[in-house]
């Protein structure tokens, strides 16, 4: 499947609001890489998915920041369950930090560290 086909596949499964968050978070990852602020694959950023569920997007483990796209971001719940099929795993350490912040601060739309 080509990258554009993957984008269409994911885009067709999410709301317009979630797609916008995915685009913005992927851009954030790429900016971090461009400025050299990443730590290879061991840094994490996450964004809350708009809506009533406690879901957020986090980077796919194993991809470099400059490889991140809206479609490669992984959607998880606060228990670490992947809620939208993804071929990518997540980093448990990154999940632990971000889920704790998102659980404690429902007003936080994005967490960067």
For each of these PLM feature ranges, what is it?
Residues 2-16, 28:
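Generic N-terminal amphipathic, Lys/Arg-enriched alpha-helix
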Residues 22-112:
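An anion-binding catalytic pocket shared by soluble metabolic enzymes
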